[in-house]
């Protein structure tokens, strides 16, 4: 019976029976129908939000005291309530509303045209690069070039002029600078100095925090430190000699102001005439260091290069009378080095160079004059730890010039900008023949094709007729360099990555 308060009855009035809803087992309203009401087979119904009409209420016949008609009765009875009855829970209604909204949003998103929703393909963005050319000796000229149409060139890092390339600029004994802007192809450059049959040819290189240069006669040499940065650099120099590390007090903490060049005479610290290697480290800033040597029989300018486990020395000139390998071990453990020569008839191991052992922090020299026998070769040096190497060569007997063959790179794409013509040498250290196509672009745009095939483990030679930008593409990695046509100098070709150092960036046009 209901707990609802009842009114008083009249004398002739019969009490009225009030029906109550049975309590639900799982909430305020029943969601199931008894088997008798549902029939023999249960009907599967889709879930839907509760409507107030779904809640069972006594039909009008019930309220009149008559038996209810099953056809008009609700499936579930509504509990009787008074005026203070609470509101029903409307959670299912909100759930359905949110579901409908989600479907609508999904349909609207699908309706947006694909061209409006898809960001453009990522574009390759390349950063600019600056090369520094160490000061040479005498009247020197800077050759700068790239596959692109122009570069910024000059003798001061903060005062460069845009120049159509390839181009040759006189810089005398100043440092040179070559800069590409963002989006341009990487630059290459070299400095050539020729005077009375004595030639130096040095590549322009990027700044770094460390590097090494090897010299045959420190008593007639100096180091030139170039700081192209906008902040001061603090440089340490360590010399490695035949007996180990040389005491070089005063070569620590050398300060080089922004945009300045500082000359360090090596004879002050080492007046010996045996080969040494100078290790350069910059604690602050990035620098380029070159070494200059002079002697009655020649002169040379050398750019620093990093130590490496594999060192390639390309374009060893033919018909040299002297060939001395200078190798240094910058590590703290004994180092074993193997040498392979890549000659025109195939690879071979030079006599005495099959296994070279070097003490820690020391420099040695190995005579390879007879082993190379005056052949045009490329050398490959390998070790389990980083090493530093150069090949000192001297021309025919009676000549007065010499050269230090410096490290080159192994790559499918090689480039260099030449201030003069010469002999191109390409070496293949792989096990399969490599075909290559090359183009020499001269000032004014004239192009000369240079094509050929380099057998496995051998060296190919060909003429480069004039100054210009040389671009070589091989079917597999090659190493290469150009031997000067006058005097004796060797310029290594630079590896050019098939994609620039820039990162791929996706620009979304919808973002503002």
Locate each region found by the language model.
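Hydrophobic alpha-helical membrane segments, chiefly transmembrane helices and signal peptide h-regions
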Residues: 91-112, 278-280, 287, 337-339, ...
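Conserved functional hotspot residues at active sites or interaction interfaces
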Residues: 85-145, 188-226, 287-330, 387-432, ...
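Terminal targeting segments of Actinobacterial cell-envelope proteins
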Residues: 1-90
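Intrinsically disordered, low-complexity Pro/Gly/Ser/Thr-rich segments with frequent PxxP/GP/PP motifs
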Residues: 156-174, 245-273, 347-374, 443-469
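Short acidic, flexible loop segments centered on an aromatic residue
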Residues: 125, 130-131, 225-245, 282-283, ...
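Solenoidal tandem-repeat scaffolds enriched in leucines and small polar residues
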Residues: 252-343, 350, 354
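Solvent-exposed, non-transmembrane segments of extracytoplasmic/periplasmic domains
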Residues: 145-209, 216-220, 224-226, 232-241, ...
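Short, aromatic- and glycine-rich surface loops/edge beta-strands on solvent-exposed regions
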Residues: 174-184, 274-283, 376-384, 465-483
């Amino acid at each position: 019976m209901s707990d609802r308060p009842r009114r008083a009855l009249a004398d002739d009035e019969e009490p009225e029976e009030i029906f109550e809803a049975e309590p639900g087992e799982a909430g305020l309203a029943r969601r199931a129908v008894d088997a008798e009401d549902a029939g023999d087979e249960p009907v599967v119904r889709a879930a839907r939000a509760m409507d107030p009409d779904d809640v069972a209420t006594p039909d009008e016949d019930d309220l009149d005291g008559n038996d209810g008609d099953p056809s008009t009765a609700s499936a579930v009875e509504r509990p009787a309530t008074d005026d203070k009855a609470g509101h029903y829970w409307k959670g299912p209604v909100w759930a359905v509303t949110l579901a409908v909204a989600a479907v609508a949003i999904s349909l609207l998103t699908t309706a947006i045209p694909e061209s409006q929703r898809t960001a453009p393909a990522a574009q390759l963005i390349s950063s600019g690069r600056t090369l520094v050319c160490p000061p040479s000796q005498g009247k020197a000229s800077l050759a700068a070039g790239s596959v692109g149409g122009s570069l910024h060139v000059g003798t001061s890092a903060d005062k460069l002029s845009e120049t159509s390339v390839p181009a040759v600029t006189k810089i005398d004994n100043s440092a040179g600078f070559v800069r590409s802007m963002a989006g341009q192809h990487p630059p290459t450059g070299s400095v050539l100095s020729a005077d009375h049959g004595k030639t130096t040819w040095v590549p322009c290189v990027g700044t770094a925090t460390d590097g090494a240069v090897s010299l045959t006669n420190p008593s007639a040499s100096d180091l030139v430190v170039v700081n192209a940065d906008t902040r001061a650099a603090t440089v340490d120099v360590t010399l490695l000699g035949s007996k180990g590390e040389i005491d070089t007090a005063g070569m620590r903490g050398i300060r080089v102001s922004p945009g300045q060049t500082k000359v360090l005479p090596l004879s002050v610290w080492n007046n010996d005439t045996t080969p040494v290697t100078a290790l350069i480290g910059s604690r602050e800033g990035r620098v380029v260091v070159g070494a200059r040597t002079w002697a009655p029989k020649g002169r040379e300018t050398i750019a620093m290069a990093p130590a490496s486990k594999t060192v390639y020395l390309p374009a060893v000139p033919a018909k040299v009378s002297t060939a001395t390998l200078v190798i240094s071990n910058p590590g703290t453990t004994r180092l074993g080095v193997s040498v392979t020569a890549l000659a025109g008839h195939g690879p071979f191991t030079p006599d005495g160079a099959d296994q070279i052992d070097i003490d820690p922090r020391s420099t040695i020299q190995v005579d390879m004059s007879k082993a190379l026998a005056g052949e045009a070769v490329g050398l490959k040096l390998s070790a389990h730890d980083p090493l530093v190497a150069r090949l000192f060569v001297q021309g025919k007997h009676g000549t007065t010039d010499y050269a230090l063959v410096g490290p080159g790179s192994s790559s499918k794409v090689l480039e260099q900008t030449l201030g003069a013509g010469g002999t191109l040498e390409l070496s293949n250290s792989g096990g399969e023949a490599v075909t290559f196509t090359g183009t020499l672009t001269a000032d004014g745009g004239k192009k000369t094709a240079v094509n050929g095939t380099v057998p496995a483990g051998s060296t190919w030679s060909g003429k480069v007729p004039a100054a210009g930008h040389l671009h070589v593409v091989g079917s597999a990695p090659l190493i290469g360099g150009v031997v000067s046509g006058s005097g004796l100098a060797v310029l290594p070709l630079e590896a050019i990555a098939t994609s620039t150092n820039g990162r791929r960036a996706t620009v979304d046009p919808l973002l503002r």
